């Protein structure tokens, strides 16, 4: 029936069309037969991909790009939380988690016309806990054809929904100790006492007794304590030093009157303690509170906000060992501060102790040996690279950097405001021209070049005229002594003849070996760091030789060349041990959690010196002649000393009136009980090497081999007591003294 009805309608419509007159059919448009129709214009809008939006948000989170994360929030979410609070939520969570790395991935997507849900998984790698993993749901809404995030706290962790927060409870182990090679503490956590004197409260006749007790407690030399007392006598309070609480209690047990003596003040504190006002403070270093700009970084490592960290030296290098592993529990707390659940927990592990290569007794004496000068002295075990002492002067008391120490109020300015820069480690951070000490390298280059032999003779006169238009003068000219005359090469080093070495530098340059001397210096370890990584280090400077003037300057250790005392000590050690350049090291071992060592010292070879055994022996012999031959520049400084010493004097001219005083050498005793050592000493703008640094070198050997000084300095009335004002340079030291550009006419030996 339906089919018939449809057919009837079709017939009626057909009849109606056929009955219409043809003349009434009028086209609606005027078109030419066969003309193409216009191309339809279609506009297709693609639906945005919710998964792509979610992945972008998670990628921004991983990069901690909070600005772009916030820009992806829906309007209602941005209205609910300001940008600053949004960032704070993520940073607080990251700090509590001790987050180190975040990885997220989308698991699935459910999309509706105007909303979507994206399931994702986040994996949190933390420094304090095992890996934390959570599966979460992200809700999105379509706004202006763009997917936006409906944000809430649960997008960080599901446990944070409803305004919950994370809370981290940290338990830190006691910081490990830094010790010398024999186990003597150089830094430790301890109950300490700040010791000072109120001059107006000192009973008549008791000042000497109180000062001697203060010196005994603090380990500071009595002379130094007396000087502090005399200098600050008119002050209300005189800060003397620090001591262990137990030591003070023991002394008070022997002298009960000390407790009631108002003149001697004791103020207790508990913190990092450095004995005797700092033994090797530049090498050991110190701790400080976490700087504000690094607080977030250390929070993520599990440090509490009030923690102290190693700020320099071995305290900084060994932070991971010394800090141990902090125990911690991670809680979820509700808006009222009530614990909801514990997310993670780990147990603390004890810290480790660092045993240095330093000998505390030797170090203390080396520090005293250069006290009063600006400069440095370094003692290295010749055949291994162990650093036995590293002293920089002026020194400083690390205890004064602790705000818990009452004395820091009164004396911290001595450290930070001093023009002598006591915090600067001159042993490794100050580079100097080294003067005639460099002639050791020049002699090596001369012998290895084939242009000279140890028997080559040169006439050492007052003048050197081989440079056109310039006359240079030997040190004997300024001293008004006879010129040295004919000298073979070994005697040239012994006499430190400047014309001899100017001649070598010039001949190497003119023979086409323009950089031969510079390359030899680099092979001896100059011009780059030694590789010690336990303290900051300057690499010095050895530049290519560009002219004849450069050549003669470099040959005597002047011009643009610069080196640190550590580099020079390491260099002469290599000469003395047969040609092996070792990496200097400060750490003997690190004692692990179970008493076993997690690090043990091993000698590390940098390279072999590029010099034949025969030529090296010639240099060694010449260095021995410097000390033992009656014409040697250091002969008088070592009269009566019977040790086998090989050394070289140096006086490096600077822009100041007086040169830097250098002396560097090594011993060759071959003893089993005391290894041979190499020593470098520099005293800034103090005078000639033979007159100042050679004397300091001698004292260091006396202390090393005999346990105490035996020979007075010319400027002492008794050991460490000056009969005339201590030579104190007037220039302020810098990490790199300005080089002298033109050849020096009267360099000193």
For the regions a language model picked out, list residue spans one by one.
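Short, gly/Ser/Thr-rich active-site loops of penicillin-recognizing serine hydrolases
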Residues: 32, 38-39, 597, 696-749
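Bacterial N-terminal signal peptides that target proteins for export
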Residues: 1-6
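Solvent-exposed, polar/charged alpha-helical surfaces in well-ordered, non-transmembrane soluble domains
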Residues: 48-63, 67-71, 84, 88, ...
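Short, low-complexity N-terminal intrinsically disordered segments enriched in polar/charged residues
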Residues: 21-59, 63
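Extracytoplasmic/periplasmic proteins that interact with beta-lactams or build/remodel peptidoglycan
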Residues: 21-27, 105, 112-376, 396-422, ...
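Beta-lactam-recognizing serine transpeptidase/beta-lactamase-like catalytic domain environment
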Residues: 333-343, 383-436, 441-682, 689, ...
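Short solvent-exposed beta->alpha transition segments
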Residues: 42-45, 51-52, 56, 63-117
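C-terminal motif of bacterial Sec signal peptides marking the signal peptidase cleavage site
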Residues: 15-18
């Amino acid at each position: 029936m339906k089919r018939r009805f449809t057919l009837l309608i079709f017939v009626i419509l057909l009849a109606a069309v056929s009955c219409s007159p043809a003349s009434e059919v009028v086209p609606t448009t005027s078109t030419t037969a066969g003309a193409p129709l216009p191309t339809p214009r279609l506009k297709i809008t693609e639906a945005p991909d919710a998964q792509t939006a979610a992945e972008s948000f998670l990628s921004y989170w991983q990069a901690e790009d909070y600005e772009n994360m916030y820009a992806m929030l829906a309007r209602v979410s941005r209205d609910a939380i300001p940008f600053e609070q949004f960032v704070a939520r993520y940073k607080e969570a990251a700090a509590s988690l001790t987050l180190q790395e975040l990885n997220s991935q989308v698991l699935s997507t459910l999309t509706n016309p105007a909303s979507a849900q994206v399931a994702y998984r986040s994996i949190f790698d933390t420094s304090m806990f095992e890996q934390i993993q959570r599966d979460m749901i992200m809700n999105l809404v379509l706004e202006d054809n763009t997917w936006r995030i409906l944000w809430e706290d649960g997008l960080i962790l599901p446990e944070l929904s409803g305004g919950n927060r994370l809370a981290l409870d940290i338990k830190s182990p006691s910081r490990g100790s830094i010790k010398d090679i024999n186990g003597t503490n150089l830094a430790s956590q301890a109950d300490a006492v700040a010791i000072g004197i109120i001059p107006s409260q000192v009973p008549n006749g008791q000042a000497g007794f109180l000062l001697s007790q203060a010196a005994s407690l603090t380990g500071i030399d009595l002379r130094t304590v007396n000087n502090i007392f005399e200098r600050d006598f008119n002050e209300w309070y005189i800060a003397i030093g620090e001591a262990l609480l137990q030591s003070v209690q023991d002394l008070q047990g022997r002298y009960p009157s000390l407790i009631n003596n108002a003149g001697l003040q004791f103020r207790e504190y508990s913190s990092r303690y450095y004995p005797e006002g700092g033994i090797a403070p530049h090498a050991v270093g110190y701790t400080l509170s976490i700087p504000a700009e690094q607080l977030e970084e250390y929070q993520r490592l599990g440090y509490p906000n009030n923690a102290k960290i190693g700020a320099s030296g071995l305290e900084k290098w060994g932070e991971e060992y010394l800090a141990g592993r902090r125990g911690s529990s991670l809680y979820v707390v509700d808006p009222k501060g009530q614990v909801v659940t514990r997310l993670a927990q780990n147990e603390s592990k004890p810290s480790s102790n660092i045993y240095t290569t330093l000998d505390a007794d030797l170090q203390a004496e080396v520090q005293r040996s250069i006290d009063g000068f600006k400069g440095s002295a370094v003692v290295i075990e010749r055949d291994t690279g162990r650093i036995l002492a590293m002293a920089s002067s002026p020194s400083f008391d690390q205890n004064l950097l602790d705000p818990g120490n009452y004395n820091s109020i009164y004396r911290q300015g001595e450290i930070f405001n001093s023009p002598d820069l006591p915090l600067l480690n001159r042993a490794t951070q100050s580079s100097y021209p080294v003067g005639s000490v460099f002639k050791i390298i020049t002699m090596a280059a001369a012998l290895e070049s084939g242009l000279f032999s140890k028997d080559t003779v040169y006439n050492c006169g007052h003048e050197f005229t081989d440079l056109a238009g310039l006359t240079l003068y030997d040190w004997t000219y300024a001293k008004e002594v006879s010129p040295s005359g004919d000298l073979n090469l070994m005697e040239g080093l012994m006499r430190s003849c400047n014309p001899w070495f100017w001649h070598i530098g010039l001949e190497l340059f003119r023979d086409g070996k323009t950089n031969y001397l510079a390359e030899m210096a680099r092979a001896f370890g100059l011009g780059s760091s030694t590789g010690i990584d336990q303290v900051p280090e300057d690499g010095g400077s050895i530049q290519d030789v560009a002219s004849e003037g450069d050549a003669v300057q470099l040959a005597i250790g002047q011009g643009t060349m610069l080196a640190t005392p550590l580099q020079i000590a390491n260099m002469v050690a290599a000469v003395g041990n047969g040609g092996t350049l070792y990496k200097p090291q400060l750490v003997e071992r690190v004692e692990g959690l179970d008493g076993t060592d997690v690090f043990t010292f091993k000698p590390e070879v940098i390279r072999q010196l590029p010099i034949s055994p025969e030529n090296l022996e010639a240099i060694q012999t010449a260095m021995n002649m410097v000390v033992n031959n009656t014409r040697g520049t250091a002969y008088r400084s070592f009269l009566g000393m019977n040790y086998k010493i090989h050394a070289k004097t140096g006086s490096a001219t600077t822009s100041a009136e007086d040169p830097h005083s250098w002396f560097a050498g090594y011993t060759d005793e071959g003893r089993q009980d005391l290894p041979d050592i190499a020593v470098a000493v520099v005293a800034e703008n103090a005078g000639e090497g033979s007159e100042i640094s050679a004397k300091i070198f001698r004292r260091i050997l006396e202390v090393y081999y005999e346990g105490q000084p035996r020979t007075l300095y010319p400027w002492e009335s008794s050991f460490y007591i000056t009969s005339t004002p201590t030579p104190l340079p007037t220039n302020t030291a810098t990490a790199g003294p300005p080089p002298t550009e033109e050849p020096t006419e009267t360099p000193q030996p």
